[in-house]
From Swiss-Prot:
This is G patch domain-containing protein 2-like. The modification Phosphothreonine is found at residue 91. The keyword Ubl conjugation applies. There is a cross-link at residue 196 (Glycyl lysine isopeptide (Lys-Gly) (interchain with G-Cter in SUMO2)). Keywords: Isopeptide bond, Phosphoprotein, Ubl conjugation. Residues 198-247, 413-482 are annotated as: Disordered. Signal peptide: none annotated. Residues 220-230, 456-469 have a biased composition (Low complexity). The modification Phosphoserine is found at residues 31, 86, 88, 447, 449.
């Protein structure tokens, strides 16, 4: 027997040596590329065989030795909390080879783990999933209820529009400029709002739907280990990973349902006491925007016309024009005074004035009462220009009237001293001219600038005469009509 064993061993050694020699001969005959490939194959075989061999040796405990089994279970219990990095089922090695984990644990480093080490550790499983804690809060549920688009907007084809866009579109449809008789828009009672009962019913329906949806979401999250952060109605911890928390950017004002913002601010506007018939007639089942009460355009026009017809309008014109009379306007003033004096001194104009005053005494009285400049021009000019805000006769008269007082400082510097003194004493000069009519004529050749004084004095005389006749006319003929 020993000889046979020895012979077999020697034969095996010879065959192995022959095999090795044959392989070496083949490698020498092969090209360098093929040699490299064979080397790689051998290395791979070695690795695989070592790994499987080690696993087989570690797992093959003898059934008789109970102590070895106890030690293996202890090792598995110690390794479980360390190696099980996630709650998912993808760490298959830890479940199939618990003894391997003990060996891995002994090979791991004992120092404190840093981020770089945990990322680059060789014994770490390839996939690690983040634990996501999902919480459905009451705020989230209420926000989702209020952000739900209504059935009316779905019928109108704007299901996916935001509340702000719907408000804007409805604002364009219900423009506030309506031609109402009283000058205001439709009153708040005629505007269509949802009553409280309809609103409550709709909210109850939406809350029921929301409860069902949130229950479904919760059950899905419990069954599946990881849910995406874009699930509706759920606020997760990893939503703010993009830089800013979306919940802080949320603008929440009262109720988010479109059309209820103004009734919340002004609760008296929402009519709660409407009956069913009125609600059906006025169409309260639809949303409507509550516009603020604004006057209509015809009412604004009427207000402005009434404002312009007030008795202070002419005086306002005077004040407005007086602001412009700062510079040199002597040429315009002389033209205006000549025109007025020509109109007033015309005999035909005087006769016309008398006829008008005799036929219509109330017109002359009104003209004198409401118009401070009525003595300066004829009544037909007033009647023709009554629709205007400020007639040309008004303007020319007020320009002449303003400059009858002391002239500007430029005029005083330009004129000589006697002329300036004469112009400064203008109230007394009127009476002096009435007593001595030859004084302006004698002063004319003395200075070239005295023509302005001559014209103004002539205009003053004419206005004095017309004022006297105008005030006498109604008194002479009024007893006949009374």
């Amino acid at each position: 027997m020993d000889e046979l064993v020895h012979d077999l061993a020697s034969a095996l050694e010879q065959t192995s040596e022959q095999n090795k020699l044959g392989e070496l001969w083949e490698e020498m005959a092969l090209s360098p590329r093929q040699q490299r490939r064979q080397l790689r194959k051998r290395r791979g075989r070695k690795r695989r065989s070592d790994f499987t061999h080690l696993a087989e040796h570690t797992c093959c405990y003898s059934e008789a030795s109970e102590s070895s089994l106890d030690e293996a279970t202890k090792d598995c219990r110690e390794v479980a909390p360390v190696t099980n990095f996630s709650d998912s089922d993808d760490t298959m090695v830890a479940k199939r080879h618990p003894a391997l984990n003990a060996i891995v644990k002994s090979k791991q480093h004992s120092w404190h783990e840093s981020d770089s080490f945990t990322e680059n550790a060789p014994c770490r499983p390839l996939r690690r999933r983040r634990k996501v804690k999902r919480v459905t809060s009451e705020v989230a549920a209420s926000l989702q209820q209020k952000l739900k688009v209504s059935d009316w907007s779905y019928e109108r084809g704007c299901r996916f529009k935001s509340a702000k866009k719907q408000r804007l579109s409805r604002w364009k449809e219900n423009t506030p400029w309506t031609s109402s008789g009283h000058g205001l828009c439709e009153s708040a009672e005629n505007r269509t709002f949802l009553s409280k009962t309809g609103r409550k019913e709709r909210m109850e329906c939406e809350t029921d739907e929301q409860k069902q949806g949130s229950d479904e979401n919760m059950s899905e999250c419990e069954t599946s280990s990881v849910c995406s952060s874009s699930d509706t109605g759920l606020f997760t911890n990893d939503e703010g990973r993009q830089g800013d928390d979306e919940q802080s950017d949320w603008f929440y004002e009262g109720e988010c349902v479109p059309g209820f913002t103004v009734p919340n601010l002004l609760p008296k506007w929402a009519p709660d006491h409407c009956s069913e018939v009125e609600r059906m007639d006025s169409g309260l089942d639809k949303f409507s925007d509550s516009t603020f009460l604004l006057p209509s355009r015809p009412a604004q026009r009427g207000y402005h016309t009434r404002l312009n017809r007030l008795p202070g309008a002419a005086a306002r014109c005077l004040r407005k024009g007086r602001r412009r009379l700062v510079g040199k306007e002597t040429s315009i003033n002389t033209l205006g005074t000549e025109r007025i004096s020509h109109i007033i001194s015309d005999p035909r104009q005087k006769e016309k004035n008398k006829a008008l005053a005799s036929d219509f005494p109330h017109i002359s009285a009104c003209a004198h009462e409401f118009n401070p400049l009525s003595p300066l021009y004829s009544l037909d000019v007033l009647a023709d220009a009554s629709h205007r805000r400020c007639s040309p006769a008004h303007c020319s008269a007020r320009q002449a009237n303003v400059h009858w007082g002391p002239p500007c400082s430029r005029d005083i510097k330009r004129k000589r001293k006697p002329v300036a003194t004469a112009s400064l004493s203008s109230p007394s000069a009127v009476h002096m001219d009435a007593v001595e009519p030859t004084t302006p004529a004698s002063q004319a050749p003395k200075s070239p600038s005295s023509e302005w004084l001559v014209r103004t004095s002539a205009a003053e005389k004419a206005t004095d005469a017309t004022t006297a006749t105008f005030f006498k006319m109604p008194q002479e003929k009024s007893p006949g009509y009374s």
